[in-house]
Amino acid sequence: MRGRITMLGVSRWSEKGGSYSTIERFFNSNIDWGLLNWKFIKTHLIRKKSIYLLGGDEVVISKDGKHSYGLDRFYSSLENRVRKSLAFLNISLIGVDARKAYSLINKQIIKESKEGCVKDKSAKKSKSKKKKNKRGRPKGSGNKDKKEVELSPYLKFVQNTIKEALQWINREVNIVYFVYDGAFGNNSAVQMVKRCGLDIISKLQKNSALSFPNEEKYSGRGAPKKYGEDIDYKNLPEKHLKSDVTDEKSHIQTKIYQMEMLHRKFADRLNIVIIQKIDTITGKMTHVNLFSTDLTLGYDKIVDYYSLRFQIEFVFRDSKQYWGMEDFMNIKKTPIYNWTNLSSFMVNFAHGLRQNHAMKGMSILDLKAHCHGLKYVKEVFKLLPDLASDYLIEMVSAKIANLGAIHPSEKVA
């Protein structure tokens, strides 16, 4: 269909039985999109003996007005500002060999659950001054187990979504790693993912206070020393260097280091990969800290798996550009949920169509042009007498369906 993807637009392009009332009932019905997406992915897109990751990201949908369910002010990375919008958590299955992400489910983020608290406007500030606590550690307090952290409402929301996805996937595909951006570069998020039975691959802050494990011999007095020397990002040990490549055109030298390190706010050791880039002309230097809780994972796979997380952005791009994620005008909870999930399902559906050899090289624009052509041919032949042969219909369909396509189909649909 052309133009804005709304309920009215869908009804106009639908065949018999696709009236506006029918479309409206569809978007107000309860649909298990996660299971539906998984059934489609399992049947048409999964490759045997391939490696798959579970990835997550947030998508922000711009929305004006006042009455949309979940409407609030969220940060948009595209606009680089906070704006009035709807926010969703997306969980996707990422194929390492196919280099593609297949959306499983979108769940709406409500601001209270993201922040972890709800402001109580009725509560008044107490005028009485609180007694100041004494300096230092309270007497009799014990060490806190960093593995037994209390999850915020937002992390519980993410955890429940991951567990829901794993219920379908683990019967067919063995998922080991969960990939997320730097927002999960903290101990609470790491423990949340580990409670789901997965290892995490994410990013730490550039100035993270990492330390090498202590290698000194135990002196025999007191608790054994756990932390060794702190990391110096400008002078990384050469013994941990894994790759050193220089691009002669851009004059950028890329060094990759891998080492097991400790962070005082994390419960366990981390598999750290530092990607250092140096301008060979100016000498300017920058770096990125990636990490995984799997201490046996190689540096190349950590870099590769983390970069594959960006494939989810292409799901968002196609959902917004072609399938109505930015166009819908519904304001109630269920229709909003159905629209966002239908949009991402159509991205999976387009991947499934391209499994057909005749449509393998076609883009989404080509697929839409192809379907437009077939629709026009069908409407034209309805106006003609019943004299057209099947061969004529097939030949005309093949010609018209390829009009406007950049990569035309090799065969008639």
Regions found by a protein language model. Give the residues of each.
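Basic, amphipathic alpha-helical segments enriched in Lys/Arg and hydrophobic/aromatic residues
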Residues: D327-K382
